[in-house]
Amino acid sequence: MNPQELKSILSHGLLSFPVTDFNAQGDFNPAGYIKRLEWLAPYGASALFAAGGTGEFFSLAASEYSQVIKTAVDTCATSVPILAGVGGSTRQAIEYAQEAERLGAKGLLLLPHYLTEASQDGVAAHVEAVCKSVNIGVVVYNRNVCRLNADLLEKLAERCPNLIGYKDGLGDIELMVSIRRRLGERFSYLGGLPTAEVYAAAYKALGVPVYSSAVFNFVPKTAMDFYSAIARDDHAAVAKLIDDFFLPYLDIRNRKAGYAVSIVKAGAKIAGYDAGPVRTPLTDLTAEEYEMLAALMDKMGPQ
């Protein structure tokens, strides 16, 4: 799949990022991961991101990363395209990127470089180096310390033909509008704020109709129903799902830092696809919070 073909796929439909399965000892559990991917693939996501932020990329050893990507690529070879999360320092990100390409990933999600604050030029040089290290398509994730502006994204688009997507995790509307207007159809644009459904209608109005869903991991039918309502501008259906599910969900998720990942793993367990515990420094939901989520999911009916 060439970068432009990937761009076309990412320009439509719902995207998601599977959690990574760990066993009771905290080691990667490929059997559980295969089962998860086989369950999720038929629901109709346009692409899946393996070892993304919700997939706990930040906690994976290099050898585990290879196992996760290979398992995802092999399992979904005939069902849904797999993009691999990559990140860390520039050299680390290049190593991950080249390994993901070798293993057959169709593209990359370039996660923010970890912790280090850097100038716009430095971040742009980081993105350019990763893009030029591979031939597959790359989506850059503007979030936290990675905050590229429209000027630099335009320059990167000229220098890196395989930079085909922009994912926004900042929620800066002025910046998002300036990037969307400046770059036009050069990129596919993805909404990437945590629990993106809450922002989906607003982002669609900005020209960003595609987003990645965390809750697809455990209520995939509900996630697809919500996306369909957004796509057809069914405001009543959107409002009902936000009131009935997403706002109560946020009340649980926002109780503690890091719960954006923890609550998804809890949901997967409730759904019958236990992915094991999160790795430190994240913490799992409390028993009370787990029961609150279970009751909320029950209201959504069979998936």
From Swiss-Prot:
Descriptive protein name: Probable 5-dehydro-4-deoxyglucarate dehydratase
Cited InterPro entries: Aldolase_TIM (IPR013785), DapA-like (IPR002220), Dehydro-deoxyglucarate_dehyd (IPR017655)
Residue ranges of the TM segments: none
Pathway membership, UniProt: Carbohydrate acid metabolism; D-glucarate degradation; 2,5-dioxopentanoate from D-glucarate: step 2/2
EC numbers for this chain: 4.2.1.41
Statement: the UniProt record of this protein carries the keyword Lyase: yes
Species in which this protein is naturally found: Pseudomonas putida (strain GB-1)
NCBIfam families, per the entry: KdgD, PRK03620.1
Keywords assigned by UniProt, alphabetized: Lyase
HAMAP family associated with the record: KDGDH (MF_00694)
BP term (GO), one: D-glucarate catabolic process
Family: Belongs to the DapA family.
